[in-house]
């Protein structure tokens, strides 16, 4: 009996051990990863929205907010703020101890706004790193030539920081990159010719810097490129012919706010997948090529502030969200029919486009979703009341320098409206109290009369009217 009893106990013990071996255990993350992450947290001096509140010593760091693990090693770190929430940011520096996260493949520190310091050298000690997105912060100094040692990277983004100096030529060694995003810094000099070696690129965004010189003619090297953003720099010369090689796949072509010269290339009509074409604020001349009629999928077109001339081609768009042809040498005479028939449009800017029509004759397919309308400096007559009183989301209406005649008190000022400029027209009536909700107002040089309501706007917003009075203008005369 004793032998049977001992045998039974032994079998029970073996059964329990077997069960325990089959039951998964919840091992904590590696101590090096925990140490590195806590060092990062200690470098943060302000975390008003408590993004790192779950990061506590002694708890499993694989369960912390923004941390992703594989086999108990941290592989991704994603701490992201929300730009629409003022308190969603982190202040402080990025601890070099993140180099302890040797299994890290992706680091995403985005929209944190107040992280400071130089180029993060810890990146050079992470052999598995493939994705770097440190965006919308205040990192500064130069991007070091040693960035070329990060040859395993597939994405590199320091979008909207404060880096200065040139783009290092060594970046040409990062041949695995599919995304290179350095927009929104203070970079200077020319685009390194060696970037042509990065033939896997799908995104190349260098906008909002101080880059100069001609745009390199090397775009045949990028068969996969979908987004090219070079706007708001100091580029000169003509639009490179090799951009034509991007026609099969390019979706965004943004070259605006530079000093480009020459004509708009006819080959742009081959970009059948193009969503956005921005050539505004350059020094382009000649006529708009008729081949642009082939851009049936275009949703955003900006050719403003150039020296382009008539005739403007009839476009075959299925719907356009944003159009800006302002300040060229066009004489459109009327708002184009392909604009009028567009089933959806948010922003229409046709300032100084030689439009001569009665506004009531413009009957757009929809007005409900208009955000911005700029018809300034044309020869438009009539009244905008019927048009504007049908909009519910209007943010800005500019129509200065026309011959519009209407009673300002009849205008329905929707809650979303922030900018109203109807200066230098034939507007009459009184200034309604509702204008107090606007951010900017200009009704100068019209035929308005009466006492001004309480206002935050300067006198220049009301000058040149028949008989307006009251602060900030002269006091009204007592009857």
Placement of each model-derived feature along the sequence:
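Plant-biased, solvent-exposed loop and capping regions
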Residues: 1-479
